[in-house]
Amino acid sequence: MARPTVFITRKVHYEALSLIGEECDIDLWEQDKPPPHQLLCNRANNVDGIMTNVMDRIDVEFLDVAANLKVISQIAVGLDNIDLVEATRRKIPVGYTPGVVSEVTADHTMGILLASAHRLAESERWVRNGQWKIAFHPLFWLGSEVHHSTLGIIGMGRIGSEVAKRAHAFDMKILYNSPARKPLI
């Protein structure tokens, strides 16, 4: 019996490739840019599974030529690029990775918050340009205090909740908008 073939539209971690390769033949798109839609469609008729990214359009045109497709796996949280109604109609299961970037996105959010409040990008450019050698007012570079400040969060889903957890470490007052009250906030 032939092994199933999976088309992977992005470079993924070696360990993931190794695991998939134990059970399947892999057709890997190795370029940094997303594969063109026509290329996806051209390869669709020879694969049993596809591992996609949000930049790959999995639409009726693709599904029409993907006669052997048994599964779609999205390496992302969102599914806007996949025609879920059509995949469901054809009984092709679609997997995705909910929550996979919630914590790192919250970390990044706090990093941007701190960098903005303390004018880190401006300060870095200022030092690189040698401007630290001239007279300046030192309070200018202190920026705004994050500790004990108030933070507004629009949407208290996975990412918003993770941001709130981090904000608590700074004793920040949290104001948020969400369809449901979050008792832990």
Where would I find each of the regions flagged by the language model?
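Phosphate/diphosphate ligand-binding glycine-rich loop within oxidoreductases
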Residues: N46-R128, G143-S144
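Short gly/ser/thr-rich secondary-structure transition/capping motifs
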Residues: E30-P35, N53-V54, N129-L139, L184-I185
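N-terminal glycine-/charge-rich "phosphate-binding" loop or analogous flexible N-terminal tail
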Residues: M1-V47
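Structural detector of well-ordered beta-strand residues that form the stable sheet scaffold
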Residues: F7, D27, V71-S73, P93-G95, ...
